[in-house]
Amino acid sequence: MEELAAHAAPFLSSLTPERREAFVLRVERWAPDLLEGLAVFGDEALARATAERLVEVAARAYAARPDDLHTLDARRLLRPGWVQDPAMFGYACYTERFAGDLAGLERRVDHLERLGVTYLHLMPLLEPREGDNDGGYAVKDYRRVRPDLGDRDDLRAAATMLRGRGISLCVDLVLNHVAREHAWAAAARAGDRTYRDYFLVFDDRTTPDAYEATLPEVFPDFAPGSFTWDDELAGWVWTTFNDYQWDLDWSNPAVLCEFAEIILALANLGVEVFRLDAIAFLWKRMGTDCQNQPEVHELTRALRTVARIAAPAVLFKAEAIV
């Protein structure tokens, strides 16, 4: 475990000795869980290399984490069951309907406080594709806020304001798919093999037809089937939901590492809770409905472990699909 922690050293040099030691202790505590989760990839050397990369991701985020969020981490470590406190009271809303935009939340926070709200879920907040976007769940950029709601600075300000009033901010994080216009998909369409491998693409209908023998249709009326032909890819791409929502290949460790970075970047803006949207669909297995496969739990475990190392105040909430 010390070898894993050593990969973090170059990113922690600017921190105090106490803060560096705290990170190393967390790596030592959670490394076994991380490696067990990464065993999902079926190759010990690959799991180890992925763990090293994730520790580096965690170290960079930890070093950049604001002091007030480090303080929140310390408080949450002292009360690990904080979210199960009977006083916790959640409220979910569409930002534009409730407050107009992120800046408008400050005008409504007194109302939330009177209700006793301690947990605010803003649906969906990240930048979607233009046009049809599945109600905002076809994300074009996970690092940008919907332009009509504000920007990253507005998100940081809103999270800080809410936290000061005792309210934890929750946002949706779509894990199964990205919009066709996402930078990864655009690179894949442009011929970049690295990003093509982020998706499930097939040259002909042989494999898609075999999968579809047991796959239910999510939107049979207006988005039948689970695969879409794309001329630029010259292949059939897996699209569980809509033809503009491309499923990611979570058997590729690079996808896991990308989302670890996204989660920690948003956590450093003050997001405390992530609702993991469409998480049941992450792992594909021939002959099944490709939902709630055991590997999904291991992938979630790996992501959760990275958060526990870099930002232990963060909580995951998985969408249940049964």
Task: Specify the residue positions occupied by each region the protein language model found.
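Pore-domain-biased detector for 6-TM cation channels and related repeats
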Residues: 262-265, 269
